């Protein structure tokens, strides 16, 4: 067995698990949200969008838009089109605590969340300064830089720039220093308790670092961040979700557990998440081994087919499951990565639907493995039932040569002609199905 074959065998489990780890592996569910199909020699992995309505037609429409985080660019274009039909889109993104807004029931809670938001924005300002050798001149410049790096941060940035009382944070930059300011509950300078002015300056540590590693005026620090999922996507010849979708859109809102909350819950319970640890340690042994194996199977159709079958099989097994443990996850990972993060999404959905004027339609845009739990909650809590489904092809690999594809096209065209000649009146249903196959086959002709 050659090295590439050994690598493919070694990745049979871990590669498909890596793709699912972002969304938390499989979920117990009545409806499948992932599947693999082989049609005319073409192996495809697909994810589902399911629309939920009350049987009497009243109330909200909620769509569960399942996604896999690596796929063809055309797949993500299709997903964006589906999401465009909903008034509000709730998307997953584990971010710092201050990225989810400053809403609170009391002034004390608003103050604490405003402090979290200011810390989050300052961390983005630190990233700007490290990359550019100077502070951002304005919040607008900081936003443009941040969103250019990751569009998922567009809405979190906007949320964090508004304090708990609905006023925009102040920002001043001069002489290499900067500070963020909230005037507190009373909106006026001075005050105490909840009316206390909140002022968050540039970190002194960063000032020292900047002087020690001062950049020339036009020099920029290279971005050396590594992404295991990008390397996985490159090995499969597909794209990353986060780099294929522009999240800076009206109505797109982050809905997830803050990273600090995930870690705090684990610490309080004395637990460890092997999945979170692997993903957070870029220089760890597990990631290093995965990178080594991926380098050996890059652009391998055999490897891509294996991953498609593994992902589809996981989704179909989840759809059949009616209870018990979720395959591939330990008890801790199952609870923290799926259950508790899903609870945060449902809380945000409940807030939206509880408004005096709720949105007419909401999409939950999450890893397909989360959807079974969401579906059960929609049914039990809001009486919503699945009304329609659309399957989208995330990636595929062709087993057939161009010659064989052309031969199948000719055979189907001949069959359609014979059906039409024999029974013109009843030919439509059969010919319509064959026409769809023809359309897919013609796309594969080189």
Model-derived features: where do they sit?
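Bacterial N-terminal signal peptides that target proteins for export
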Residues: 1-7
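Low-complexity, acidic interaction segments enriched in glycine
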Residues: 111-213
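Acidic/histidine-rich, surface-exposed loop or edge segments in extracytoplasmic proteins
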Residues: 58-69, 99-105, 327-332
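Short, surface-exposed beta-strand/loop micro-motifs that present aromatic residues
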Residues: 46-54, 167-172, 179, 350-351
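Bacterial N-terminal signal peptides
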Residues: 7-16
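Zymogen propeptides
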Residues: 23-92
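Hydrophobic, often amphipathic alpha-helical segments used for membrane interaction and targeting
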Residues: 23-29, 38-41, 101-102, 203-361, ...
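Extracytoplasmic/secreted cell-surface and envelope-processing proteins
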Residues: 72-75, 97-103, 191, 371-375
């Amino acid at each position: 067995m050659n090295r590439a074959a050994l690598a493919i065998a070694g990745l049979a489990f871990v590669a498909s698990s890596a793709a699912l780890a972002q969304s938390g592996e499989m979920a117990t569910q009545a409806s499948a949200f992932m599947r693999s199909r082989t049609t005319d020699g073409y192996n495809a992995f697909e994810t589902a969008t399911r629309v939920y309505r009350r049987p009497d037609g009243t109330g909200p429409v909620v769509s569960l838009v399942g996604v896999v985080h690596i796929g063809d660019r055309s797949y993500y274009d299709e997903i964006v089109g589906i999401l465009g039909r909903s008034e509000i889109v709730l998307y997953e993104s584990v971010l710092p605590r201050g990225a989810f807004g400053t809403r609170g029931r009391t002034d004390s809670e608003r103050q604490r969340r405003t402090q979290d938001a200011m810390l989050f924005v300052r961390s983005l300002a630190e990233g700007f300064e490290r990359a550019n050798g100077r502070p951002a001149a304005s919040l607008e410049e900081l936003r443009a830089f941040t969103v250019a790096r990751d569009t998922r941060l567009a809405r979190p940035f906007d949320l964090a720039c508004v304090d708990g009382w609905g006023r925009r944070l102040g920002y001043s930059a001069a002489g290499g220093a900067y500070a963020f300011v909230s005037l507190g509950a009373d909106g006026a300078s001075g005050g105490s308790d909840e009316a206390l002015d909140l002022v968050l300056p540039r970190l002194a540590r960063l000032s020292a670092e900047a002087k020690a590693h001062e950049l020339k005026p036009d020099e920029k620090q290279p971005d050396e961040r590594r992404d295991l999922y990008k390397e996985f996507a490159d090995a499969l010849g597909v794209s990353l979700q986060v780099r294929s979708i522009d999240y800076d859109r009206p109505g797109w809102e982050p809905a997830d557990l803050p990273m600090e909350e995930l870690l705090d819950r684990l610490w309080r319970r004395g637990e460890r998440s092997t999945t979170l640890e692997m993903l957070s340690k870029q220089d760890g042994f597990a990631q290093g081994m995965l990178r080594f194996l991926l380098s050996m199977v890059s652009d391998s159709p055999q490897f891509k087919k294996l991953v498609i079958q593994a992902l589809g099989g996981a989704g179909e097994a989840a759809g059949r499951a009616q209870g018990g443990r979720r395959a591939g996850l330990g008890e801790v990972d199952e609870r923290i990565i799926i259950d508790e993060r899903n609870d945060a999404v449902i809380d945000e959905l409940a807030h939206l639907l509880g408004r005096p004027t709720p949105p007419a339609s909401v999409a939950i845009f999450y890893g397909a493995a989360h959807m079974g739990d969401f579906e059960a909650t929609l049914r039990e809590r809001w009486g919503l039932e699945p009304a329609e489904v659309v399957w989208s092809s995330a990636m595929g690999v062709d087993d057939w040569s161009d010659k064989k594809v052309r031969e199948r096209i000719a055979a189907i065209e001949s069959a359609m002609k014979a059906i039409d000649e024999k029974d013109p009146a009843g030919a439509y249903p059969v010919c319509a199905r064959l026409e769809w196959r023809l359309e897919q086959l013609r796309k594969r002709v080189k």
